[in-house]
Amino acid sequence: MEIILGFVALACGLIVGLGAIGASIGIGLMGGKFLESSARQPELINELQTKMFILAGLIDAAFLIGVAIALMFAFANPFVSTLLANMPK
């Protein structure tokens, strides 16, 4: 049973870590493109800034969904409850 808990902890770490890496890369690329486009056309800064913040929120929402799934696996793990139900007594 300890090996399953170890693998669950590893999976939770991977979910959160890779999600954070992906979100930070996505927001970094988006911010760079925002700066390029606002330098090219300064009259569109207000429209571009609004769209950039909406997209940043969507990117962060995907990461937070991953965090919620990792927390579900960490605290309300369906695999461990199934394992405990099927263990011989």
From Swiss-Prot:
Subcellular location: Cell inner membrane
Transmembrane parts of this sequence: 3-23, 53-73
CDD domains, A to Z: ATP-synt_Fo_c_ATPE
UniProt xrefs under PROSITE patterns: ATPASE_C
Function: F(1)F(0) ATP synthase produces ATP from ADP in the presence of a proton or sodium gradient. F-type ATPases consist of two structural domains, F(1) containing the extramembraneous catalytic core and F(0) containing the membrane proton channel, linked together by a central stalk and a peripheral stalk. During catalysis, ATP synthesis in the catalytic domain of F(1) is coupled via a rotary mechanism of the central stalk subunits to proton translocation. Key component of the F(0) channel; it plays a direct role in translocation across the membrane. A homomeric c-ring of between 10-14 subunits forms the central stalk rotor element with the F(1) delta and epsilon subunits.
HAMAP family for the chain: ATP_synth_c_bact
Assigned protein family: Belongs to the ATPase C chain family.
Protein name as annotated: ATP synthase subunit c
Organism from which the protein derives: Verminephrobacter eiseniae (strain EF01-2)
